[in-house]
Design a protein with these regions (language model features):
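Rossmann-like NAD(P)-binding element
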Residues: 55, 60-92, 99
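Short glycine/serine/threonine-rich phosphate/pyrophosphate-binding segments
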Residues: 13-16, 82-86, 112
Length: 139
C-alpha cells in the first residue's frame, strides 16, 4: 500500500483518487477550495462525476501540509494556471524520496515551462508526467 497525497479535487484528481483508493492505497485529497472539501466529505459525490461513488476510505483535508507529509507519492492534479502557486505552497512539506507526479497539461505563458519543469523549478526535484485524454469519467 502506498500513501498518496493528491493536490486538486477536480474531475481528474478525484477520478484518480478513487481509482488509487479502490486499488488498495491510502489516499488523501486536498483542495484550495475549502467548500469543495466540505462538500466532497459530506456528500461523497463530485458534482461533475455524478455516477462516481467516492469510497469511504478516501479521505480529504484542507491542510496542504497534511496532504504532503509522510506520503510516498504526491500527485499534482490542479489546473495548469495553479501548478506554480500550489507547488510553492507545498514546497516546505515536500520530502526527499517522494515521487512527484503531474497530470496537468499546458505551458506556462511567461516562462514557456511545461508543468513538470515548473514543479522542478519550485520543488527543486524532478517529477514525472501522466498524460491522457480528459476522460476522467472513464476511470
Amino acid at each position: 500500500m502506498k500513501r498518496i497525497g493528491i493536490l486538486g479535487a477536480g474531475t481528474w484528481g478525484m477520478a484518480l483518487a478513487r481509482m488509487l483508493t479502490v486499488s488498495g492505497n491510502d489516499v488523501l485529497v486536498w483542495s484550495a477550495i475549502e467548500k469543495e472539501i466540505d462538500s466532497l466529505s459530506t456528500t461523497r459525490k463530485h458534482p461533475n462525476l455524478p455516477q462516481m461513488k467516492i469510497p469511504d476510505e478516501l479521505r480529504f483535508t484542507k491542510s496542504i501540509e497534511e496532504v504532503c507529509k509522510d506520503k510516498d507519492i504526491l500527485l499534482f492534479a490542479v489546473p495548469s494556471v495553479f501548478v506554480r502557486s500550489t507547488a510553492a505552497k507545498a514546497r516546505p512539506y515536500v520530502a526527499d524520496g517522494q515521487i512527484i507526479v503531474d497530470v496537468a497539461k499546458g505551458i506556462e505563458p511567461d516562462t514557456l515551462y511545461t508543468m513538470t519543469e515548473i514543479l522542478a523549478d519550485e520543488l527543486g526535484k524532478e517529477g514525472c508526467l501522466l498524460y491522457t485524454s480528459d476522460a476522467a469519467d472513464e476511470l
